[in-house]
Amino acid sequence: MPFIVNTDQDTREMLSVLGAASFDELIPDIPEEIRLKKALDLFPAMSEQEVKRLLEGLASSNTSTSDYVSYLGGGAYDHFIPSAIKTIVSRSEFYTAYTPYQAEVSQGTLQAIYEYQSLMCRLYDMDVANASMYDGATALAEAVLMAISVTGRQEVIVAGKLHPHYCEVLKTYLEAGGHSAVVQNTLENGVGTLDGLGALLTDRCAAVIVQQPNFYGSLEDVEAIGELAHSKGALFVVSADPVSLGLLAAPGSYGADIAVGEGQPLGNAQSFGGPYLGIFTVKQDLVRKIPGRLVGMTKDRNGDDGFILTLQTREQHIRREKATSNICTNQALNALHAAIYLSLLGKQGIIDVAEQSALKSHYLAEQIADIPGFSLKYSAPFFREFVVETPMAAREVISNLLEKKIFAGCDLSVYDEAGLLVAVTEKRTKAELDAFVEYLGALK
């Protein structure tokens, strides 16, 4: 909404209608001593052309994946976004509308969310999906709270290498709710050990969490982890990358009770870290504990199909202590991006994206491993992301490659670990991959 300043004449007319001589008469409750007595230190008045030039100048100091070749990953990935998505999402019915509190008035919005839910159920091989959570981290935290509520237990075990940011969000949720802290399983070769998990598991465990692929990009033994979790009556919670499911087994196929994920790779831009999209799916027997919004299909009195918000267990609708979650909204626009993305690609399309990402990442990993001084930190199978040990600090590699207009990856020293986390998507060409290897080999 544009800001159009009031003229002196506008101000006089408004004060006259209100029966006030000055603006100060409208704010008598604000003590005189804390009122601002001087003019704000603002830019001088500018024309539209001048404002546009100023903002473009400020924006030009930023860099983006449109201008640089990106190997950044660690939770946000540079996948191709078909231009049709923006065209459809930008329709005023979608872009400006917020689902009203009488939600059934917005049948188009509800149907779009319903289609998104249906796609997530198919992708994750689960029975029910909600309308989305804030992002992958909050979806995982809500999944753990749900597991605690369902089982009546308190302990939570992370079976493999979980994204550090997810760990922090999970810790915040659990501490605020007075629940037990998260226990980390031992790692070997970048993945969780089954012996370590078996030693940690007791009948006090509410949930066993695994990220697939994990933070390092490596593949965990999810089937064995799920069997161990269920052997002690714990719920098996999987945080699965949605693009990986074009190649890897879906969580529902290996026994996940709750499957969540970060939906950013599904047609959503990296956008400096958000807004993103939390995917949340469950098996049928847990549907009444699912948090967030849930859109269902029904029949109206004329027998026509209609869409409604169903099982409304949010604190907006019932007593707070009875609510399944205090998240009272959803990422509808981001979910729409994901639904359109998957609809445009189709089943074979998401397989192609996953295959290209995997093949190109393995090609790059093999080439980097042949550079003197560079090596792969882990030998475990991976999907599109891997950790490289470098002959110099990872931050130096990143700094040097920026001069070549390349985002070389994520510096793991941020998380008190050594290595460079490199991610490859279907966007990368062989020429770009070969150039990256050449530049790495030339570093001194």
Swiss-Prot record:
It comes from the Bacteria. The keyword Oxidoreductase applies. Keywords: Oxidoreductase. It is an enzyme of class 1 (oxidoreductase). It catalyses: N(6)-[(R)-lipoyl]-L-lysyl-[glycine-cleavage complex H protein] + glycine + H(+) = N(6)-[(R)-S(8)-aminomethyldihydrolipoyl]-L-lysyl-[glycine-cleavage complex H protein] + CO2. Signal peptide: none annotated. Its EC number is 1.4.4.2. The keyword RNA-binding does not apply. InterPro entries: GcvPA, GDC-P_N, GDC_P, PyrdxlP-dep_Trfase, PyrdxlP-dep_Trfase_major, PyrdxlP-dep_Trfase_small. GO terms for molecular function: glycine dehydrogenase (decarboxylating) activity. GO terms for biological process: glycine decarboxylation via glycine cleavage system; nucleoside metabolic process. Belongs to the GcvP family. N-terminal subunit subfamily. The glycine cleavage system catalyzes the degradation of glycine. The P protein binds the alpha-amino group of glycine through its pyridoxal phosphate cofactor; CO(2) is released and the remaining methylamine moiety is then transferred to the lipoamide cofactor of the H protein. The glycine cleavage system is composed of four proteins: P, T, L and H. In this organism, the P 'protein' is a heterodimer of two subunits. This is Probable glycine dehydrogenase (decarboxylating) subunit 1. The gene is gcvPA.
